[in-house]
Structures are given as C-alpha cells and as structure tokens.
Amino acid sequence: MRTMIRLLLVAMMLTVFTAVCFTQPAMAGDTTKLDRAVDKALKKLYAKSPAAVKLSREAKAVLIFPSVTKVGFLVGGQYGEGALIVDGKTVGYYNTVAGSYGLQAGAQKFGYAMFFMDTASLEYLNNSSGWEIGVGPSIVFVDEGMGKNITTSTTKEGIYAFIYGQKGLMAGVGLQGSKITKLNP
C-alpha cells in the first residue's frame, strides 16, 4: 500500500512538473514575444488600476510577469517569465518559479507586477542570485480597496505588488515562496 502511494505521488509530481515546464515556451534567446506581452500587460493593468498608474510614476522599477501558469493536484507548481522595466526600458529578464504541496487541485493563469519604490529594494533584486519572495524587502499586495488609498506620500519604500488577470480554477493565488531568478537570454 505504501509503495502504491509513493508511486502515485511521484506520478503526480512528474505530471505537475511537466505541465509547468512545458505550458509556456522558454525565452530561448528571443525576447521579442516577451517584450510584447509585457507591454500589453502593463497597458491592461494601468487601464484597470489607477493605483498602479500612481505607483508607476514614483517607482524606481517595475518587474512584470505577464503570464504565470499554476497547476496542482496535491503537489503543485507555477512558472512564468517577465521583464524588469526601468525608465520605460527593459533592463533584464526574469523567471518566477514556485512549488507547493497540500490540499490543492486545478490550473490557473495570472500575471503580476511588482513596483520597486526605493533603491534598496531594487538593489536587493539585482544583487541576489535568486530572490525568494517573503525573504528580503517587504512586499505590500495591493487590492482594490487599498488601491483607492494609495498616495505618493504613503509609497516611499518597499515593493507594491498587483496580481491581475486570473483565469482558471484554483483556490487562492499567492506569491509567498516564489523564487525570482535573472535570465540570461
């Protein structure tokens, strides 16, 4: 019986790993498609969220992942690729990867944008060889209610994150434990 459970868990982990790794093509040196997706995602976010527009005016940089795929059945994972924008120009490419286990089932796509409000937070990203969210600079997740109260005087430091464009069915979306790593196209 224990052997059967172990085999089932291994099969589920392989299924999740395969789905996460192959649902989106890797960047593989061609960044044009990713650049277009980033531009489109930022325009959509700014059209829907006045708070994101306010933050973008004061932010030192914006790290945006236009499409992150999350799948899971007891064991889960997520993967997405994005770009770091400074002064309206792409200065680097990153991926986000996370794994999880527990009571979960489903598949979902979403995007997220992180607004770096101070130099220290941006330097932490640039100097780390893989940054795990939840370790390092503080991150504030902005929802509609909070977004209405954002002013330039309240957003001087740290990182503000927006999760948007959720499609699919999976209980909850979180970034805790996600690891962000710089890509070398």
What are these regions (language model features)?
Residues 4, 21-22, 69:
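Exposed boundary/loop context
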Residues 14-25:
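C-terminal segment of classical bacterial N-terminal signal peptides
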Residues 1-13:
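Bacterial N-terminal signal peptides that target proteins for export
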Residues 27-185:
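Small-residue-enriched, tightly packed secondary-structure blocks
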